[in-house]
Structure formats: structure tokens, C-alpha cells
Amino acid sequence: MDMFEYYGYFAEENRSDKLIEAENRVIDALFDRYLPGSGDLLDSSAGTGRNAFRLANLGYTVTAGDFIMDHVETIRANPESAKLKETYCSSAHRLSAFGNESFDAVISLGSMYHMRTKAEREVLVKESLRVLRPNGIFAFSYMSPMAMTFGQYFNAMRTYKTQDRMKAYRKLANVEKTHVCDMFHGMSLEEMTDISREYGLKILTVASTYGLLYDMADEIEAMSEEDYEAFVKCQINCCEDPVVARYCMRGLFIAQKKELDLFD
């Protein structure tokens, strides 16, 4: 399954389970805490528009793009698209349509963990920072190395043919070494620190948005409203702990672009 097939199948409008809802509520809490509160905002991995519409309703001037045209068409077909400044189709690391320092905030949720090489990830960072104003906020979602390793481990354990299982375990060894599994890359906190030093970013937070909870999905769906609200509250309260952020499935990196001086 390539990325176009994957996102066609798992499009946001089809993802309404409580686990995804909990992740969205964590993301909302983090954006409310760290985004500037107003200004020009670029959502360069907008999916079908969930975050773009919410932020436009909060008063941001939002430009929304995605690399899958079906997603862009879904955004444009939504009546709320009238609240967006612009929509477009392009990858999050191809922002040549925008001038330098055009936005007060740039968010990219879902693209970084598909950039499987360091060079690709650095292009995404450089382009995002090019269009971001000094002191602006840059946010991207990540998947952790542990998520890559656990995902392939469970794949191996669910394989019942001897030869296939041996291949799966050898793939697991490579995933553990490279942090790459199929179309996904797991970014370490150390790489985030290196990127921040290299490109003049002040890290505001690194937070878990989605724990390693695949096998809990049915349990969470069956929760009472009271238990579910307690679960979400716990997710929000714990999300910025460094250990939780290191061992999550998905997380959110949020940083501020430094205003460079003569010594930088």
C-alpha cells in the first residue's frame, strides 16, 4: 500500500473512533497553548481540513494544502472552506508558491514521518522556516522509533509461516537500526534537538498525542463517558512528559523560529 492508497483508506473523515478523537483533543490543547492566537497560518499537511477549519474558526487567517488532491477537493467541498484564505495541492516540503516570511505559524501534521531520509526531513524543515516569520511557531507531528519497532514486532508475531516469520524478524532488526518501517520513519528526540540547533529553533514542547494503544481501541470504544473523559484528561496531563513523548506512537513537536542576530 503506497501513501495515496493509505490516506485514501484512512482519510480523516473515516476516522471517528474514540482513540482518534482523544488524539485530536490533545492536539487542540497543545495548539491552544503554543500557537500565537492569531495571524497568518499555513497548514501544509491539512488532510481533509480538520485542523485548518478549527483554527480558522478561532480567528487565524489559514492557508491549507495537502499533497493528495482528493483531500484538497474534500476541503473545498466543505462549506467551511469559505473561511480559509487559500487551498492548494502540494507536498509539505515544496512551498515555492509562498514568499519568504509569509506566515506567523506553520503546522505540518502527517508529512514528517513519511520523509524517510534525513535529507528529505531537512528540506521540509528549511522550507517551513523559510516561509515562517521570525519568532513564528513551527509544529510537526512525528512517530517514535519505538512505534516503528513495536509495529514490526507485532507484524512478526502475527505471522504463522516459519519462513515468513524469519523474514519478518530480520526486517525487525533493520527497523530497529534505521527507524524506518515501510512508508514510515520514527524520529528520535535527539534528532529533533539536532534539527533545532542546526536551524535556529527554540523548542517549546515535544508531546505525545497518541500512545501505543492499538490493542486498547476496543476497550476505549466501550468506555463510559465518565471513564473516557478521565482517559482523555490523563492523555492531556501526561503528554508533555519527556519519557511519555519518547515512547509514544505519534507526537507533536512545537518550536519557535529564533530571530537571528549578528552572532548567529
Predicted features, each with a name:
Residues G49-R94:
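Class I SAM-dependent methyltransferase SAM/SAH-binding core
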Residues T205-D264:
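A C-terminal cap/extension of S-adenosyl-L-methionine-dependent methyltransferases
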Residues A105-A119:
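A short SAM/SAH-binding and catalytic strip from SAM-dependent methyltransferases
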Residues M1-G37, R50, R54, F138-K167:
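Conserved class I S-adenosyl-L-methionine
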Residues M115, E176-E191:
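Acceptor-substrate binding/catalytic loop of class I
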Residues E122-P134:
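A short glycine-rich, Lys/Arg-flanked "PGG" loop and its adjoining helix->strand segment in the class I
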Residues S96-V106:
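A short acidic, Gly/Pro-enriched loop at the edge of an enzyme's catalytic core
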